Amino acid sequence: MTAVAAVEPLPYSPEQVAAALGGGWRETLMAAHRWMILGRALDARMQALQRQGRVGFYGAATGQEAVNVAAGLATAPEDWVFPGLREQLVALVRGHRLGTYVHHLFGDARDPALGRNMPCHPSAREVHYVSMSSVIGTQVSQAAGLGYALRLRHDRGVALAFFGDGATSSNDFHAGMNFAGVFGLPVLFCCTNNQWAISVPVERQTAAPTLAAKAREYGLEGRRVDGTDVVAAYRAIAESIGRLRGGAPAEMIEFVLFRMTPHSSSDDPGRYQPSDWMARARAHDPLERLEQWLTEHGMLDAAAKAVAVQRADESVREAIHEAESTPLPGPATLTEGVFAPSAPATTESL
């Protein structure tokens, strides 16, 4: 049996965290903790429901919560998010309703897309969260296009594109990065390098020393950040957004993290990952790292954690009950949102 490594501690004093997060840093950390617990509860329940045949598909974000929560907390309402498979927490932190997201997972009549998208492909117009595509890398060029529109409109918003290590080998990655570099657009490219593109290890993905190094060839600033460290992730995203909002050109951050679950509910990582992978991943569990720091500095105890876990679990179960009590979209909805209303033709319109 492989021994479980001790959790890697977050390397900060309270003063360093305050300098990184600014005023209200305690509230920011506690909010991050609550959201990460909710994400973990959502992942656990949805993976179980998928195995029971109650949800058709699910892609968990376990291990990526620090980046997702940091992005949700560091962005402003005018910013836009172009997600990959695992960024649902970004939408929730930005204000998307948990119940609405769960309706989407079930594809019921209260799903904004009326069941037309597969699970984990939501959109949330009210928080500028654009529907993802299963085609790898498309969000990179889409975010660049939105960045161009923001620049033309003199809009203060910033476009954030989230993609995995595998997407850096896609055509759209090249097109989007190059376009953003040429035109100096307000786009933050967030590469969540969980070290596996389904079964392909990152060392088979590129000969470059890092994925961040690719950004420099497009004339962009590129850097690596520990994606299991919520303080580092928040600081990196907030600083980049601040520069972009001030007129700086696009940037790329490579967040190095560990995928702690199968790629999706259709995957069996035991067939390709080394036997010690999960032990290494657990040593960098972003939730455990944050909880350890909060406990050591008197901001979290067992009772408070239990309350947070219970509330998150109740919220998820309530949303599931609401979704399972909702009927599926009826046949009459098939044409909703497909055809625009048309007025009768007149002589003037011909």
Model-derived segments and spans:
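A general secondary-structure junction signal
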Residues: 85, 255-257, 338
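Conserved acidic/glycine
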Residues: 1-67, 261, 267-350
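Generic, low-specificity signal for short hydrophobic/alpha-helical stretches with a mild N-terminal bias
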Residues: 18, 24, 28-31, 53, ...
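Glycine-rich ThDP/TPP pyrophosphate-binding loop and its adjacent helix/strand module
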Residues: 128-325
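A generic structural signal for short, non-catalytic loop/turn and secondary-structure boundary residues
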Residues: 29-31, 74-76, 115, 246-248
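Cofactor-binding active-site loop characterized by glycine-rich and histidine/acidic residues
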Residues: 41-44, 48-183, 201-207, 212, ...
